[in-house]
Curated annotation (Swiss-Prot):
Keyword vocabulary terms for this entry: ATP-binding, Cell inner membrane, Cell membrane, Membrane, Nucleotide-binding, Peptide transport, Protein transport, Translocase, Transport
SMART domains xrefs: AAA
Subcellular location: Cell inner membrane
GO cellular component: plasma membrane
Ranges where the ABC transporter domain occurs: 5-254
Taxonomic source organism: Haemophilus influenzae (strain ATCC 51907 / DSM 11121 / KW20 / Rd)
Name of the protein in its database record: Oligopeptide transport ATP-binding protein OppD
Protein's membrane topology: Peripheral membrane protein
Keyword hit for Membrane: yes
Length: 323
């Protein structure tokens, strides 16, 4: 079976007055229909730029290189006219901040209906009925009444539900969720994750979940890709990454998760800061922060397969971590 999305050798670069920044560096992954890929990493690791590259939404000074094949169609450098036919209808995106992503001058109903009228050619009455139905699907109370309200009349969690409803209106085959639970309290986060799982089962939608919240990843993702400085550090199933991480950065992320059952008096952290993408260290970008770094790390490692398809970008053998 061919994957729904096949990304190979993806690069994203930005020309700045200080030089060229490589935000995404040789990214490779596949995604099947109905499955969920979590992309995790610190701020600036290239997670969101990967999504923008797939959607054709890079800033004016950005350029993309490589291949991203969606259902047999190459997305990279696809003309806007063709991209517009794919966006929303086949690939949708939930943007990072629900508090600012909706038009404050338009009622919620108008914004939802516009999607269906533009992409599906629905008349006003049909678009209204379908929008109410989708608001019901995302567990919006009094959905019909909410259609006549403005964004400022909604809480953050309610706005996020509207964003999810809008993204799913056209029944896309791929949903890209960029930090969908940012700025939401933990109760609402749990509701949103439950909702996405239900919608995935109902519509067989594939999801790319971009987040720095490892709890979110554990709750919804089948596959996980750990990114650092634009590169893949490790890639595998959620079980492999959470229970058998094989890269020092992945191990550091897992160790930094606060434990309710532990007796630790101090939180574990990864020393140092993410690198400046204009002045990356020689070789492995994580080496200045890695307690296991050796002279060999001055040469950039290659992604290698370790265990049942698990990939790692490190010179050190997995045996060093007793795995």
């Amino acid at each position: 079976m061919n994957p729904l999305l096949d990304v190979k050798n993806l690069y994203v670069r930005f020309k700045t007055p200080d030089g060229v920044v490589t935000a995404v560096n040789d990214l490779n992954f596949t995604l099947n229909a109905g499955s969920t890929l979590g992309i995790v990493g610190e701020s600036g690791s290239g997670k969101s730029q990967t999504a923008f590259a797939l959607m054709g939404l890079l800033a004016a000074n950005g350029e993309v290189e490589g291949s991203a094949i969606f259902e047999g169609k190459e997305l990279v450098n696809l003309p806007n006219a063709e991209l517009n036919k794919i966006r929303a209808e086949q690939i949708s995106m939930i943007f990072q901040d629900p508090m600012t992503s909706l038009n404050p001058y338009m009622k919620i109903g108008e914004q939802l209906m516009e999607v269906l009228q533009l992409h599906k050619g629905y008349d006003k009455q049909t678009a209204f009925a379908e929008s109410v139905k989708m608001l019901d699907a995302v567990k919006m109370p009094e959905a019909k009444k909410r259609m006549g309200m403005y964004p400022h009349e909604f809480s953050g969690g309610m706005r996020q539900r509207v964003m999810i409803a809008m993204a799913l209106l056209c029944r896309p085959k791929l949903l890209i969720a960029d930090e969908p639970t940012t700025a939401l309290d933990v109760t609402v986060q749990a509701q949103i994750m439950t909702l996405l799982n239900e919608l995935k089962r109902e519509f067989n939608t594939a999801i790319i979940m971009i987040t720095h919240d490892l709890g979110v990843v554990a709750g919804i993702c089948d596959q996980v890709m750990v990114m650092y400085a634009g590169r893949t550090m490790e890639y595998g199933t959620a079980e492999q990454i959470f229970y058998h991480p094989t890269h020092p950065y992945s191990i550091g992320l897992m160790d930094a998760i606060p434990r309710l059952d532990g007796n630790e008096e101090h939180l574990v952290t990864i020393p140092g800061n993410p690198p400046n993408l204009l002045h990356l260290p020689k070789g492995c970008p994580f080496s200045p922060r890695c307690q296991f770094a050796t002279e060999q790390c001055q040469i950039a490692p290659k992604l290698t397969t370790f265990n049942h398809g698990q990939l790692r970008n490190c010179w050190l053998s997995a045996e060093k971590f007793n795995l």
